[in-house]
Amino acid sequence: MDFTQPKPATALCGVVSADGKIAYPPGVKEITDKITTDEMIKRLKMVVKTFMDMDQDSEDEKQQYLPLALHLASEFFLRNPNKDVRLLVACCLADIFRIYAPEAPYTSHDKLKDIFLFITRQLKGLEDTKSPQFNRYFYLLENLAWVKSYNICFELEDCNEIFIQLFRTLFSVINNSHNTKVQMHMLDLMSSIIMEGDGVTQELLDSILINLIPAHKNLNKQSFDLAKVLLKRTVQTIEACIANFFNQVLVLGRSSVSDLSEHVFDLIQELFAIDPQLLLSVMPQLEFKLKSNDGEERLAVVRLLAKLFGSKDSDLATQNRPLWQCFLGRFNDIHVPVRLESVKFASHCLMNHPDLAKDLTEYLKVRSHDPEEAIRHDVIVTIITAAKRDLALVNDQLLGFVRERTLDKRWRVRKEAMMGLAQLYKKYCLHGEAGKEAAEKVSWIKDKLLHIYYQNSIDDKLLVEKIFAQYLVPHNLETEERMKCLYYLYASLDPNAVKALNEMWKCQNMLRSHVRELLDLHKQPTSEANCSAMFGKLMTIAKNLPDPGKAQDFVKKFNQVLGDDEKLRSQLELLISPTCSCKQADVCVREIARKLANPKQPTNPFLEMVKFLLERIAPVHIDSEAISALVKLMNKSIEGTADDEEEGVSPDSAIRSGLELLKVLSFTHPTSFHSAETYESLLQCLRMEDDKVAEAAIQIFRNTGHKIETDLPQIRSTLIPILHQKAKRGTPHQAKQAVHCIHAIFSNKEVQLAQIFEPLSRSLNADVPEQLITPLVSLGHISMLAPDQFASPMKSVVANFIVKDLLMNDRSTGEKNGKLWSPDEEVSPEVLAKVYLLRLLVRWLLGMKNNQSKSANSTLRLLSAMLVSEGDLTEQKRISKSDMSRLRLAAGSAIMKLAQEPCYHEIITPEQFQLCALVINDECYQVRQIFAQKLHKALVKLLLPLEYMAIFALCAKDPVKERRAHARQCLLKNISIRREYIKQNPMATEKLLSLLPEYVVPYMIHLLAHDPDFTRSQDVDQLRDIKECLWFMLEVLMTKNENNSHAFMKKMAENIKLTRDAQSPDESKTNEKLYTVCDVALCVINSKSALCNADSPKDPVLPMKFFTQPEKDFCNDKSYISEETRVLLLTGKPKPTGVLGTVNKPLSATGRKPYVRSAGTETGSNINANSELSPSAGSRSREQSSEASETGVSENEENPVRIISVTPVKNIDTVKNKEINSDQSTQGNISSDRGKKRIVTAAGAENIQKPDEKVDESGPPAPSKPRRGRRPKSESQGNATKNDDLNKPVSKGRKRAAGSQESLEAGNAKAPKLQDGAKKAVPAERQIDLQR
C-alpha cells in the first residue's frame, strides 16, 4: 500500500475526544508512566488486539483512536526500557500504519524517522526463534512487509539511513532456525524498497553486497542466501546501481566510493553465480582490466574470469566471445603468475566445458613449451586431471602434449608426465573403466613409457621400472592375473618397447649380480685386494641409483651395516637368490627397510636410497610360479582356449610373443624354468611349424636346461633327436641355437656334435645352394665351440669345398635389375650360401684362436680380394649388383670380426684394415648402414682395437645426413664409454694406448693419408675433404679439454711428422701426404682450441704398425700446406657439391627432364666441417627413400650416364629450384668420381679383370671404370678426361656413395637435355654413372 502525507490537523502527543481524554479500547484503562510495567504490558496487549482487529474501513474507530495512535508514538513509548513494551508498541504502530493507510497519522518527518528507526530496532527480536515473543516479532515483520509500511519513508530526506538500518538488521538476524515465511517477508520488505524507490545508494548496496564477501558468507550462510535471492528478485532495478559501482572502482579507480572496493573481484564472482544479468554492463570493464599494465591487476582479473568461465553452469564463453578471446590471450601473458593461473583454469574448463577444449588446445600447446618449469608442469596436471575425470574431455592433441613432456629437460616435469600417463593407462587399459574405445585411445602409453628407458638419466630409468611394477603390470596382483597382464602386454608392445623392457630386466639382473658379488666379497677375509674390489663394486652399484654422488655415501654406509649385521646380510642374500619367490621378496624388502628405519628421523634419505636399491633387485614379478602361469597361458593360446582375440592379440602373435617373453626371462631367471611341466610345453613348441617359436624354445632350453640331463631324463631323451633335426634341417637360427644348446646342457657334447658334423660335412653340395645354409651355420658353430675336435676336419672342408667349389664359382646368373640392394627374401640362394660361408670361415678361425696353420692369412687375403673385386670374386660379371653389395658387407664384417681376436688383429695388414674401413663409404646405403652398426656394436663393447674407431672419420663423406648423424652419435657413445671405463678401472691406465680415445688421432691421420680420394697433397678441394673428416672426429674429442687433451692431440700430430709411414717408408709421396694430413689436423686443432699451445703432460706413443721410429737427426719443420690454403680451409667456404652426392634417391631417366622438387633438403657429401656440429640422431626409413620418382628410375639401379650441370653450393642450406648455368659446373673441382671404383692390389687377389668400358649415348664418352682399389685411377681412362681429372679427386676404394636417391634433394639442379651444340660449348660437363 502507498502512503500519502496526512493532513496537519492533529497534535503530536494526542488528540482528545470531546471530553478532552484519549480514547482507549473498551476495558483498557489509561496508559501512563504512573502504572507498573506489568500493568502497562497488560493494557498494551489489549490495545494491540484492538488495532489488530481493526480494518481500514472503520472510519469511526479510526477517528476515535487517532489520539491513541499519536499517544503511542510519544517518546515515552519509543524509548521505554522494557523490550516487551517496545515490541507491543511497535506492533501497534505497524497496525496503525496499516489502518490509516494511505494517510499516516504522523505529519512530522522527524517523528516518522524516529518511528521507523524504532520499529527497525524491534525487528532484531526475530533473531531468537525460541523466544516466547517470537510470534509477535513475526507478526510485526509480516505486517510491515504486507503493508509495505517502509515505503512512506521515500518522502523523507534521510530515508536512506532508515533503509540501511533495516537491511543491516534483517541480514544480521536471519539464521538457519527461520522458516521460509520469515525469509519471504524479509525479501518482500527489502525488494519493495529497492524496486519502488528512486534508486539504490552505494551505502544501501554495500549493505547487501557485504553478505556476498567470502568472510561474511562463511559466518552467516543464511544472510548470503537472503542477499542472493534479493538480488535475483531485483535484478532489473539493481543492475544499473551495480554497474555504476564497478565502473567507479574498476574504470575510474575510485576505491573510496565504498568499503567493499577491495573485494570487487570476489563480488563479481558471486554476482555472476547469482545471475549473470547482474553484470551485464560490468563484463566489458573486465576486458579493459585484462589489458592493464599492472601484472598483479591482470592476475586478479584472470583469477576472477577463470572462475566465471570455468564454473559448471556458465555460458559466459559463448555469450561473450570477445571477453573469452581476450582472456585466452592471457595464456601468453608476459607475467609468469598470469600464465600459471591461466593454465590452472584450463583443468576446470575442460571438465565443465568440454566444448571449449578446441579453443584451449592451441594455447596449452604453447604453454607446454613455456620456459617456466612450473607452467609446463601445470599444463600436464591440467590435462591429466581432466583425463582422469573422463577421457572424453581431452582430445588426442592434448594427450600428445603430455607425451612430449615425458622428454622435458626438467625431471619434475618429466616425472609428472610419466606418472600421469601411467595412471591413465591403469585406469582405462588395465581396469577398462571406460570401455574398449577409451582403452584404444591410450593404448600407445605403454609403448611410450617404456621407450623412456632409452634415456640416459638414471632417474628416468628408475621411474619407468616403478611405473612398470605399479601401473603396467601391478606386482600386487595375484600370480595368474599378473602374468596374464604381462603376457598380453608383451604381445601388444612395439619392437622398441619390447627392447626397452628386455633391457630393463637385463639391467635389474645385472644389478642383482653386482649385489651378489658384493655379498660374496663380504664372505672373504679382509685384504687390500678385497677392499679395492669392494670399493669398485660399491661405485658400480651407486651408479645405478639416483644422484650417484650422494648414493656413493649411502651405499658405503649400507655396506658397513651389511658387514656388521649378519641377519641383514642373510635377508639380502635371500632376496637376490634365484629361488626367491615374489612373496618372499616382498617380505625381505619390508624386513630390511624396517631394520634400517629410524623412528626419530621421519625423512630418512639413507633409507630411501636403500629402498631404491631393493626395489630394483627384488624379483617382484617373476618366480617359478609365475613362469608356470606364463607357460599355461601359452598352452591355452596354442590350444585356442585363451582370451587372445578378446585382448586384441591374434593367437599366433600371442604364442610367438609369449615364447619371446619366456626366452628373455630365461636369461634373467633361468632357475624358475626348471620343471617338467614347463619343459613339456616347450617341447610342444619345438614341434610347431612357426620357425620363430621353435627358435625361441631352443634358446630357452639352452639358457635353462643345465640340470635336464641329471634331473629330467625323459625330457633329455625327447629333446636330443629334435635338436639334431634342427641342427641339420632347421632354419639357420634354429641350427645355431640347437648346436649351442647341445654344447651347453649335455655332458657328452663331443659325441652329439660329431653326430651332426660328420653327416653334414659329407653331404655338402654346391649345386644345391638353398640346402647349404643350415649345414654351413651348424658346421661353423660346431667348429667354433669345439675347435680341438673339429678344427682339422674343418680345414679340409674349407679347402676342398668352401673355397674351391663354392666361393670361386658362380653357378647362377644374378638378376640384372640394377638395384644395389634387395630384400633378404630376394637374395639368391647361391649368394646367401657364400655369405654364410664367409661367416663359417670366421667362426672356424675364432674357435682356433691361433694362426699356426696360416689359415687366417689365407682367409684375410680372400676377404680382401672380395672387397677389391667389389663382391664379384670370379669377375665373370654373372653376379647382380645387389648380391655384390651383400658379399662386400659380409667380407668387411668378417675382417672386423676377426680383428676382435688379438691373435688375428696382429696379422691384419694396414692395407687390409684400409680396405675394411672403406666399406663404411660403400655406394650402397644399406651396406654403409649395417657396417656402421656392426662397427659401433663391437667398439662399444670394447671388443675392437681403438684403430677401428678411426673408421668413423670417413663418415664425414657420407652424403646422407642421417648416416653422418648416426656416426657422430656412435663416436660420442664410444668416447664416453672409454673415458668412463678408464675412470672406473684403476688398472686401465696400463692399457691407455688401446683405451684412451685421443689415441685414435694417429690412426685417423694414417687412414686419411691413404684415402684413395686423396691423390694430390696440394689440391684444396681434396684437403677440404680431409679437413672435414678430421673435424668430424676431432670435434667430438675436443668437446672437453680433459687432462690437457688438446695439447696431447697436437703433440701426436707433431710427432707423426718426425716419423715415416711404416706402410711405405721409402715413398716420398706417401710420406708427403701423411705430413700434409698432419698439418691439416694441426691447423684444425689450433683454430678450434686456444688451449692446445700448452705443453703436453706426457709424450704420446705412436703405433709402430703404422709409423716408424723417429730418427734422431730427423727434423721436419716444413709446412706442407700454404698459408693461402690454410686460410681457405678455415674460412668455412663449403666445397661445391655434386647433385648426385647422396644415396638411394630417384633419378630421371636418360634424356628426360628430372622431377624437380620445390626445395632441397641438403647438399651432397661435401658438407662444411662446421655444418654437422650437432646433427639429429634420427634415422629415416629406407623404404620411403627407395621409392621411384615419377620418371621411374630409382636408386640402387644401374643407370646410364647422367649429364648434369652443377653450380658450386655456397652453404649447406636448401638449394632452390633454379636452372644452373652449365659453365658454372667447372668452377669447383667437384668430386665427381666419388662413385668410381678403385684398384687395390691385395695379397691373394688374383685374376682381376680389366676395367670394362661403357659409353652413354646421351653424352660424351665416359671414362673407363677401374676396379675398386686403393690406387689412383688408371691412366687408361682416355685423353678426353685426363685434363678434367687433374682437377677432380679420385674416388674411394669401395664405390663411394655417389649416385643416390637423396642427391636430388641435395642439389635439386635441373638436367636439361643437351644438344650437340651444347656439348661443344661446355667441355667441362660432369658425367655421373650410378653403376660405378
Curated annotation (Swiss-Prot):
Main location: nucleus
Cellular component aspect of the GO annotation: nucleus
Region (Disordered): 1138-1332
Modified residues (N6-acetyllysine): K1145, K1210, K1288
GO biological process, one term: neuroblast migration
N-acetylmethionine found at: M1
Subunit description: Interacts with the cohesin complex. Interacts with WAPL (via FGF motifs) or CDCA5 (via the FGF motif); the interaction is direct, cohesin-dependent and competitive. Interacts with SMC3. Interacts with TP63.
Entry's family note: Belongs to the PDS5 family.
Descriptive protein name: Sister chromatid cohesion protein PDS5 homolog A
Source organism of the structure: Mus musculus
Gene designation: Pds5a
